[in-house]
Regions:
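Long, compositionally biased stretches
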Residues: 1-66, 84-140
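Short active-site loop/helix that positions an aromatic residue
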Residues: 73-83
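Short aromatic/basic micro-patch
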Residues: 70
Length: 140
């Protein structure tokens, strides 16, 4: 039996955004690859449709353990997510000139169905979440 949860975090896998990404509607297929050492929480999400499109992503709970949100019904249905464990949530990291300048987009998490590997970028309530939350490593 394949452990979809472990595979998607430790191996290079292909994920698909059927509707594209906001700002990149032409980019549908991405490779998600662990970035750096195996113990790092970061991954690279590189477009297979446009080599100029790529992002550093991270599981938000590494830096914000209390981060939680309700996925709207339409997104849950579109991705066939019925249980929270059916999904992997990643947030886009913006690197700064200095490591302490890095930020993470908590407003627009990327939600991936662990089994089908279909994904979308959710847009949450801007009064509750920050598009440029500080990314301050804690013991990493």
């Amino acid at each position: 039996m394949i452990d979809a949860q472990e595979d998607i975090r430790t191996d290079t896998v292909e994920i698909t955004f059927p509707a594209g990404l906001p700002g990149f509607p032409h980019a549908h297929r991405f490779q998600l690859t662990p970035w750096g050492e195996t113990s790092t929480p970061f991954s690279l999400m590189s477009s297979m449709d446009d080599s100029d499109v790529g992002f550093v992503v991270v599981e938000p709970w590494v830096f914000y353990p209390d981060y939680e949100f309700d996925l709207d019904t339409a997104t849950s249905q579109r991705l066939a997510i019925s249980e929270p464990n059916d999904s992997l949530v990643l947030c886009v990291v913006t690197l700064g000139e200095q490591p302490e300048d890095a930020t993470v987009n908590m407003l627009g998490p990327i939600v991936i169905n662990r089994f089908t590997r279909e994904a979308c970028q959710a847009v949450l309530d801007p009064s509750l979440f920050n598009v440029r939350a500080p990314l301050t490593p804690r013991g990493i």
